[in-house]
């Protein structure tokens, strides 16, 4: 079999096991796909994200990172809300552009591209700005391959 290259933006390396898994045709209407992959993934994500998974759900989005970020910001931040964006580079700045496009009220805390977001600084900022209803940040960046939290 001819080896294929996975061409995506960013410095992404793809292991042989991932390439092998990609060779399987998963149909979105198949029970195996929906029950054994999608539902399990949603359940696992809830287990990571909250201590009370019965109060929340997850929605999987297929698209670029910017597509997913815009979908979440556009669908969850209302005109009466205020968003705090913790920006540590181009992706965080892009969230500001998205918020402006949707005419949303937001503040932005700027951190260096290779700097972790300071939990203490954000906590202090939130304590002094009670009008903020939502917080957003990029937890990992493809260009730098760093985790920021």
Annotate each predicted stretch with a short phrase.
Residues 103-137:
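PLP-dependent aminotransferase-class I/II
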Residues 58, 83, 106-107:
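Hydrophobic anchor at the start of a short beta-strand
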Residues 22-71, 90, 94-100:
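Conserved N-terminal alpha-helix of the aminotransferase class I/II PLP-enzyme fold
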Residues 55, 80, 131-132:
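A general structural motif
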Residues 74-79, 101:
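Alpha-helix C-terminal capping segments
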Residues 77-93:
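Conserved PLP-anchoring active-site segment centered on the Schiff-base-forming lysine
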Residues 138-149:
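Single conserved hydrophobic/aromatic residue that forms the stacking wall/gate
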Residues 1-32:
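N-terminal "arm"/small-domain region of PLP-dependent enzymes with the aminotransferase-like
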